[in-house]
Amino acid sequence: MGRLNYSITPEGRFARAMGVELPISPKHAREICRAIRGMKVEAAERFLQDVIALKRAVPFRRYNRNVPHRHGLVGWPAGRFPQKAARAVLRVLENAIGNAEYKGLEKERLVIGYANTKKGRTFRGWMPRAMGRATPKNQETVSIEMILTEVR
């Protein structure tokens, strides 16, 4: 595995966390990061917990072919409930919050200033089929980086 670094280093007081090679969908991870970018930390936590509980949908803005409309979405009709990816993003967010508290930042003033995904390794796999054939069954991975900034 190659070395991963953070894409940006912001000015001022910040905390950051990274989830490396998480076995989740890259498309779901990208849409979730786009949805929570700019939110306050507490609102983002609530949003992700509601997605896991199937109460709020994540708007799918890019990868929305054959995605049904969901009630409750404002400004964008297509959405889904990517639970597995939401759990992974929530873990990264909780790590970033812990890092912020360790650095002495106030949780009430934290905003998700940067949330981004990067493509990770693809783990090759094969599924045996009839007549001695095999079908590829690969596992894609995603690296998520999150930077929390303190607003005044």
From Swiss-Prot:
InterPro entries: Ribosomal_uL22, Ribosomal_uL22_euk/arc, Ribosomal_uL22_sf. The keyword tRNA processing does not apply. GO terms for biological process: cytoplasmic translation. It comes from the Archaea. The keyword Metal-binding does not apply. Disulfide bonds: none annotated. One of its GO terms (cellular component) is cytosolic large ribosomal subunit. Keywords: Ribonucleoprotein, Ribosomal protein, RNA-binding, rRNA-binding. One of its GO terms (molecular function) is rRNA binding. Part of the 50S ribosomal subunit. This protein binds specifically to 23S rRNA. It makes multiple contacts with different domains of the 23S rRNA in the assembled 50S subunit and ribosome. HAMAP family: Ribosomal_uL22_A. Belongs to the universal ribosomal protein uL22 family. This is Large ribosomal subunit protein uL22. It comes from Methanothrix thermoacetophila (strain DSM 6194 / JCM 14653 / NBRC 101360 / PT).
